[in-house]
């Protein structure tokens, strides 16, 4: 906890302390304002307006950060949502499709969140450029999906990438390869906010550059920034002018987040005549999902509650699969007109996520972020849809990558679907150890991806390699202890087996 926050806490515990607390807060805001003004003076003329918008946005967020303390929800007010506010996907699908699918598709814009790097998987550059299936990247698959829609229905669904300053340059270099695809591709940038020193709460950056000493001084402030940066880019007004009505927003690493025509039809032709301004796709929790944000009823509106907002005594209750059965997939359908209205009224309310980081030099900093789904409570007639698990297929680790590269899935026009040869619709639980964390190491350890159609659970730990045409079935646990190595031989069939010890296979 910073010295300033400690001072504030002490001040609050004393009589008449609120006035003292307000003085400290105002002094701190003034100090931050001066620092930001100094930084702005270093902006080149062609970047001045853009930088000013970013720093103004940060100031508003910082002001709110100083006002809010403690958990942001009153647990006593949290209720289960009314049944009609979260619809089962089957009910949406049962309505069928309109006669003229192209007319509803032409009202849609697809937005992919493309601000993340591949560092957690040992890759440099944007995560969207990592190969995930038959040498296709996340971005390749996305373009293929939308091109397939446009060709099939003779439509003009554009793709918009929300980049960050970390991914923008590399992404733009690659976009020329899609020039001959039937997809118009647009990009805009997330804001760039300054990290603040955890003790002084002042910006770490001394100027606008993000090279040299300033490399770690800036950050993209979470995907909740989409509303302001999309509006500021001018694209929002452009699409409204073209007659577009909804954006479908999702993470680019969620391979299940394809355009769903049934959900789109429900939006364009609401059964009760009242248009939904915001739809969140949620899916049933499994054991691994207990920390995911969940939809609740709060003060009469649908609200996304994240684990960080929950008071500590209620965290276990929040994780309970029996009480809170679904979690947010971050597949969102949002009205463009509503975004414009709320943005112009400054009425989009999102909780602040305080994300502590330690820089390479050891300095402790804070970055203030927001999440796109948290804005659900600001929109009118919001709806949750409980979708099948197949619409949530994120690739966060090489364990996830193994699943999507395997014969569990087939690839068609950029979309992955579970193989009909798998008897169970559930996905196996795969845990690969630290030797597999980096994509480069992971690929080196598999001569070919094993047959996993009958696999339930795979755990691999230590120095392990797989030969060609290996088949894994049931529960398979492979543990090579420190100093040992296990080579699974080509053609091996492992069914309900624990493999340990030392097994070397060398070329003769």
Swiss-Prot record:
GO terms for biological process: glycogen biosynthetic process; glycogen metabolic process; UDP-alpha-D-glucose metabolic process. The keyword Acetylation applies. Its EC number is 2.7.7.9. The active site is at 396. Homooctamer. Mg(2+) binds at residues 127, 253. Pathway: Glycan biosynthesis; glycogen biosynthesis. Residues 457-508 are annotated as: Oligomerization. UTP binds at residues 113-116, 127, 190, 222, 253, 396. This is UTP--glucose-1-phosphate uridylyltransferase. InterPro entries: Nucleotide-diphossugar_trans, UDPGP_fam, UDPGP_trans. Belongs to the UDPGP type 1 family. The modification Phosphothreonine is found at residue 426.
